[in-house]
């Protein structure tokens, strides 16, 4: 299938070639600093959902389809999404580029490595871990950090169960007690959340410097800035902070940038990407993780309160018949079967999410994501 060159996609938003860093023919990073003076004038549409099921309800697919629909109506529309993590891509969840005709492309490249942002977050996170242990080693028992209090683990962008709990420091030359630690997935890193909340490199460095890594022997907190890790970590993230521009199958511009999980962080793409999209397009569709009680709630409570992104002008609450049946008590294996009583019972869940959105006073619609078996 032929896609538009990313230069053509950028031109749709008024982004000049000099402010693009090309990653092949269909991907590019945008120098967001060149557009910092443009205020976000567009209307933001947030896509959320009822309580998710193991099958997923299709928020990403709905968001992509809505942005394409706005483009077909002649509106200047843009899409903002999170980057896929390799862990879920190779796990039961799969990729995060939509499906069918509602898809962002180039699909394989977005799902696998993309522009290297997640690897940069991995490097920055693990640099801090290495500097923590280095400080403990060279300071000795009387140093700044009490090795028994270190809270900072390591990360990698993969589901590797064997590394969730490990013991480090068993080398006889390591000047500290061996301790139990582990590896988290990169998308769950505090660095990922920080990258997606930062407004620029200066703000990024300040936020990275505030990361708590452990305590002194007398209980005082020790931060990343105390071991001089903030500058080096920011240097590793200097390219990752720029949003990634791609497109949907129908050629609608899409910024895919950052990937914090909603259960342990705020669960939406970077503030920089959303703000840039709102300054260049009339309508911006974004997606928040999980349901209205988690991703949407955090969008209002965290993202909007930064002052960098306005509150949504409208919301879409995604539902499915299989989710209604699931929350009506039907087992996963029996979801394909017709069960009107279970659908009716499942409306209690949907009704609660409707109440959640009403609290925020934002106009919304309920979207029924239809499947062939419905």
PLM region spans:
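Flexible phosphate-sensing "switch/lid" loops adjacent to ATP/NTP-binding sites
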Residues: 1-374
């Amino acid at each position: 299938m032929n896609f538009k060159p990313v230069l053509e996609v950028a031109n749709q938003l008024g982004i000049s070639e000099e402010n693009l860093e090309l990653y092949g023919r269909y991907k590019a990073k945008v120098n967001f600093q060149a557009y910092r003076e443009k205020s976000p004038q567009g209307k933001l549409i947030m896509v959320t959902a009822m309580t998710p099921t193991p099958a997923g309800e299709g928020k990403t697919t709905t968001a992509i389809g809505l942005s394409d629909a706005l483009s077909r109506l002649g509106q200047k529309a843009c899409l903002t999404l999170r980057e896929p993590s390799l862990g879920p891509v190779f796990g039961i969840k799969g990729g995060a580029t939509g499906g069918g005709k509602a898809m962002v492309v180039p699909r394989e490249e977005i799902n696998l490595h993309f522009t290297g942002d997640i690897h940069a977050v991995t490097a920055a996170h693990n640099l801090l871990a290495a500097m923590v242990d280095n400080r403990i080693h060279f300071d000795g028992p009387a140093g700044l950090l009490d090795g028994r209090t270190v809270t900072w683990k390591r990360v990698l962008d993969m589901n590797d169960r064997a590394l969730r709990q490990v013991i480090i420091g068993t080398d006889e030359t390591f000047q500290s007690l061996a301790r139990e630690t582990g590896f988290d997935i990169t998308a769950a890193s505090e660095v990922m959340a920080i990258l997606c909340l930062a407004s620029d490199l200066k703000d990024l460095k300040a936020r990275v410097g505030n990361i708590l890594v452990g305590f002194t022997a007398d209980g005082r907190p020790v931060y990343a800035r105390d071991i001089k890790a903030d500058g080096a970590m920011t240097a590793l993230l200097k390219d990752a902070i720029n949003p990634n521009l791609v497109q949907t199958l129908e050629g609608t511009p899409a910024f895919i940038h950052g990937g914090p999980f909603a259960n342990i962080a705020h669960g939406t793409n970077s503030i920089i990407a959303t703000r840039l999209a709102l300054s260049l397009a009339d309508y911006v569709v974004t997606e928040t993780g999980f349901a209205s009680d988690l991703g949407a709630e955090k969008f209002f409570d965290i993202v909007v309160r930064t002052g960098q992104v306005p509150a949504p002008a409208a919301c879409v609450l995604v539902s499915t018949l299989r989710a209604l049946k699931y929350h009506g008590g039907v087992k996963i294996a029996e979801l394909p079967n017709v069960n009107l009583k279970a659908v009716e019972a499942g409306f209690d869940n949907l009704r609660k999410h409707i109440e959640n959105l009403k609290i925020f006073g934002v106009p919304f619609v309920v979207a029924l994501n239809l499947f062939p078996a419905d």
